[in-house]
Design a protein with these regions (language model features):
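Short, well-structured alpha-helical segments
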Residues: 30, 34-37, 55, 92-103
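Short amphipathic alpha-helical interaction patches enriched in hydrophobic/aromatic residues
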Residues: 17, 21, 44, 62-67, ...
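His-Asp-centered metal-binding catalytic motifs of divalent-metal-dependent phosphohydrolases/nucleases
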Residues: 51-68, 72-76, 97-106
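Short alpha-helical hairpin
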Residues: 1-19
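Divalent metal-dependent phosphate-bond-processing catalytic cores, especially two-metal-ion Mg2+/Mn2+ enzymes
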Residues: 22-49, 60, 110-209
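An active-site-proximal "capping" alpha-helix that borders the catalytic cofactor pocket
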Residues: 36, 71-86
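Hydrophobic, well-structured mid-protein blocks that either form specific transmembrane helices
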Residues: 79-114
Length: 209
């Protein structure tokens, strides 16, 4: 089993694909996609999935943020499918699987991803690291609501945490015993305690002013 990404594919992605993420703001920018790539490669080694396919899926997964966020996963899949350069390394069947994986990555989708590649990128995109989740949520709220003050951002942040990550939230994990399981429990403990959640919010909010 190949454990390392092809250098040729990596060079293509790093020069032609990843720079596009500089257009998307910090919450969905280069830092985020690089974390998703890192998480995906770790899961590829655990699951035995094709590491080159996993890498490409992770690299393309948010390219659709160039359009409406609500359909960005669909747009990202179309971008991948239409990129003829990928035919140098992948068959048409592999490209179709990668397109579907990109489409299936969105956290609010209740449908199980159609392949292991969709499960990997969905799991990697969850990226359940408490500080990282809080930071990205605050950055996203500020980027998309430039006129709102700190208290209004807090309300948006707290609502998002409850809606997505709480015990009744919509987030789903698809790979059993992944690192995300333990992290999600710790995150939920913080969300349950609004005073602790507010402390974390204040600390991060002040650090990014």
């Amino acid at each position: 089993m190949i454990q390392q990404v092809s250098m040729e594919i990596m060079e293509f992605v790093e020069t032609q694909i990843l720079p596009k993420y500089t257009e998307f703001g910090e919450s969905h920018g280069l830092r985020h996609v690089n974390r998703v790539i890192k998480n995906s490669l770790e899961l590829a080694r655990i699951t035995g999935a094709d590491i080159n396919m996993v890498y490409v899926v992770a690299a393309y997964h948010d390219l659709g943020m160039s359009g409406p966020r609500a359909i960005h996963h669909i747009t990202s899949g179309k971008i991948l499918m239409a990129d003829a350069r990928l035919k140098r390394w992948f068959s048409q069947d592999q490209i179709k699987i990668m397109k579907e994986a990109v489409e299936d990555h969105r956290a609010s989708s209740s449908r199980q991803p159609r392949s292991i590649y969709g499960k990997i990128v969905a799991e990697a995109d969850r990226d359940i690291d408490t500080h990282e989740i809080f930071l990205r949520a605050i950055l996203y709220a500020k980027e998309n609501n430039p006129g709102k003050n700190k208290e209004q951002i807090w309300e948006l942040f707290a609502h998002h945490m409850d809606e997505k990550y709480s015990v009744h939230g919509y987030i789903k994990l698809w790979i059993p015993n992944s690192p995300n399981e333990k992290e999600l429990k710790m995150l939920r403990d913080i969300i349950e305690d609004k005073a602790v959640l507010r402390q974390e919010f204040d600390k991060i909010y002040e650090s990014i002013l």
